[in-house]
A protein has these predicted regions:
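Amphipathic terminal alpha-helices
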Residues: 229-237, 241, 245-265
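Catalytic helix-loop patch of NAD(P)-dependent Rossmann-fold dehydrogenases
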Residues: 23, 55-104, 125
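NAD(P)-dependent short-chain dehydrogenase/reductase
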Residues: 88-135, 140-141, 178
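Conserved C-terminal active-site "lid" loop/helix of NAD(P)H-dependent oxidoreductases
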Residues: 140, 176, 200-241
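Glycine/proline-rich active-site loop of Rossmann-fold NAD(P)-dependent oxidoreductases
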Residues: 79, 92-94, 105-115, 141, ...
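Mid/C-terminal beta-alpha module of Rossmann-like enzyme folds, strongest
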Residues: 149-215, 247, 251-254, 262-265
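Conserved Rossmann-fold NAD(P)-dependent oxidoreductase catalytic core, especially the SDR/UDP-sugar
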Residues: 27, 31-73
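NAD(P)H-binding glycine-rich loop region in Rossmannoid oxidoreductase-like domains
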Residues: 1-27, 35, 53
Length: 265
């Protein structure tokens, strides 16, 4: 028997085909809910993303802030998967909880550790908004603790929770340590306008060569955002807040990256 399912599977990409993103992020979520119902699972926890708020919103956003489909396929499919889950709740099919993580980093993080290190090593990494976009890191262990609390707390049913750091840091402050790990100077920061032009060219070249370019215009826009997220609801309802400092989380991540051979480039 299974009492709670935590649905973490998703394609996290700004470059994959729309059809693949829809199949995995949306249709598979519906299929998973159907399977959960068949086996009388009580609660379904959907791991969504802060991208649900869109890229154009500014300032501190709580769970009551409207969502906005103003991004690429990742934004659209994460929003659509939330709709699937909330519809199941509204139809009394299953008890649901939605968690919207911030920029989750740590050992194994492809978008925020592995991919940037690979791009920096190849001298293919630049920051838009002159490195002043907002980054809302959450160390993976803190996120896992929060998800566990959301999965088990009796009052969490039907609720949505932001889980990120308190406040924000600039993208420059986040990515600078990765340059240091590789013994390089950086990051290189340019205007968003220039970054969009460069990323558009890179995406066209990727299309021509049949490769994926995660440094797409959608990623540029994402790294230029000026919003951060209130975590007061998770603090008050779940008794959760981040415990791992950024410095500690990055030190653990550095050791992991070294052990994986990611810094020998």
């Amino acid at each position: 028997e299974c009492d709670v399912i935590i649905h973490t599977a998703a394609l996290v990409s700004n470059a994959m085909k729309d059809s693949d993103m829809w199949r995995v992020n949306v249709m598979a979520t519906r299929n998973f809910i159907d399977a959960a119902k068949e086996y009388n699972v009580r609660r379904f926890v959907q791991i969504s993303s802060i991208v649900a708020y869109g890229n154009s919103a500014e300032g501190e956003l709580d769970e009551n802030h409207p969502v906005h489909a103003d991004g690429g396929s990742y934004v659209l499919t994460k929003l659509a998967s939330e709709h699937v889950v909330l519809a199941a709740q509204a139809n009394h099919e299953i008890e649901v909880v939605i968690v919207r993580p911030g920029d989750a980093y740590g050992p194994g993080s492809r978008p925020w550790i592995i991919a940037p290190l690979e791009a920096i090593s190849k001298r293919q990494f630049i920051l838009p908004a002159k490195g002043e976009g907002f980054f809302r890191p959450i160390y993976i262990d803190d996120l896992v603790r929060g998800i566990a609390k959301a999965a088990c707390h009796s009052d969490a049913a039907g609720e949505i929770f932001n889980m990120s750091c308190e406040g924000f840091m600039t993208t420059k402050d986040y990515f600078t340590p990765l340059y240091h790990w590789l013994g390089k100077k950086g990051p290189i920061s340019v205007s968003t306008k220039l970054a969009l032009k460069i990323s558009a060219i890179a995406s066209k070249l990727a299309d021509l060569t049949g490769t994926l370019n995660e440094a797409s215009p959608a990623t540029v826009v994402q790294l230029s955002t000026k919003s951060w997220f209130s975590i007061k609801k998770a603090e008050h309802m779940l008794g959760w807040k981040p415990e791992v400092s950024f410095e500690e989380g990055m030190e653990i991540s550095k050791k992991w990256a070294l052990d994986q051979g990611l810094l020998n480039k």
